[in-house]
A protein has these predicted regions:
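Catalytic-core regions built around general acid/base machinery
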Residues: 36, 84-95
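Conserved CoA-thioester-binding segment of acyl-CoA-metabolizing enzymes
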Residues: 1-54, 90, 187, 261
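Helix-loop "lid/cap" segments that line or gate small-molecule binding pockets
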Residues: 159-160, 211-215, 229-235
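Terminal peptide-recognition signature
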Residues: 14, 18, 32-33, 51, ...
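Glycine- (often His-adjacent) and acidic-residue-rich active-site loop
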Residues: 53-88, 107, 219
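Crotonase-fold acyl-CoA enzyme core
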Residues: 90-203, 237, 242-245, 251
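Terminal low-complexity tails and localization/encapsulation signals of metabolic enzymes
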Residues: 1, 245-261
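Conserved phosphate-binding and hydrolysis motifs of nucleotide-dependent enzymes
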Residues: 17, 23, 55, 61-63, ...
């Protein structure tokens, strides 16, 4: 789930609050973030939104129990659950308030997708990030449009297919993080960004964000629908069944090849 607070300046803070699960995304968390994006976006008193994670990780991606349930579900259920994640990303991305991400620890899969829809994200040294879906026989489909929009095709293809982990410094080079600061400076770095927005006209900020999305060739509903369709198709493959089964059995998947001696 998430925790939410709004201070007397109109700065809202959303906290991914499943630290024991490394803030993995389950259905309840996705729905809560979608609802928060709609409510905060419609609240004229809210000037900026900060998103962070509680505990050792920012967001470890999809919840393992949720993923296991998808493996056992029918096609219609999988499509509905993919739409749930897509709706969350769409709502956060289109929220007419500046969204500032404060990242630490691990950010995998959907956690990278959340970072990609932040108007800016700040990280700390020692982070590990990655699109790890292909290790499971899946693809980073639903988050894909936002990752491509953030990084551009050339940079995204460096990490989109290999499930390779990368650190905060590389995330800056990829365009995913704006900058990296020491952990003890993360709060102040985010606060500096918030203060900049508090000096701006809120209606103009919302209009500028909408214009940036429109001029950039922003993610479209058609792209979202396509990402859901290809993810559902991938779930039906033998690779997906093998990858998920191997993960929960804590064994290498059938396609894993070790480095030559």
């Amino acid at each position: 789930m998430i925790e939410q607070s709004i201070d007397n300046r109109g700065v809202a803070t959303l906290v991914l609050a499943r630290p024991e699960k490394h803030n993995a995304l389950d259905a309840a968390t996705m729905d809560a973030l979608t609802d928060a994006a709609h409510r905060l976006g419609a609240d004229p008193d809210v000037r900026a939104v900060v998103l962070r994670g509680e505990g050792p990780s920012f967001c470890a991606g999809g919840d393992l129990g949720w993923m296991r349930a998808q493996m056992q579900a029918d096609a219609a259920t999988r499509a509905r659950e993919a739409r749930r994640l897509a709706d969350m990303l769409w709502a956060l991305n289109r929220m007419p308030k500046p969204l500032i991400g404060a990242l630490h620890g691990n950010a995998f899969g959907g956690g990278v997708g959340i970072a990609a829809i932040c108007d800016m994200a700040i990280g700390v040294p020692g982070m590990r990030m990655g699109l790890t879906e292909t290790r499971l026989g899946l693809i980073p489909a639903t988050i894909g449009p936002y990752v491509l929009a953030r990084m551009g095709e050339g940079r995204a293809r460096q990490i989109f297919m290999s499930s390779r982990l990368f650190d905060a410094a590389e995330a800056v080079d990829l365009g995913l993080l704006a900058r990296v600061v020491p952990p003890e400076e993360l709060h102040d770095a985010v606060e500096n960004e918030v203060q900049a927005y508090l000096a701006c006209a809120p209606g103009a900020v919302a209009a500028a964000k909408a214009l940036a999305l429109d001029l950039s060739g922003a993610v479209t509903p058609e792209q979202v629908d396509h990402s859901i369709a290809v993810l559902c198709a991938q779930w039906e493959t033998p690779e997906a069944r093998e990858g998920i089964a191997a993960f929960f059995a804590k064994r290498p998947a059938a396609w894993v090849r070790q480095k030559s001696a």
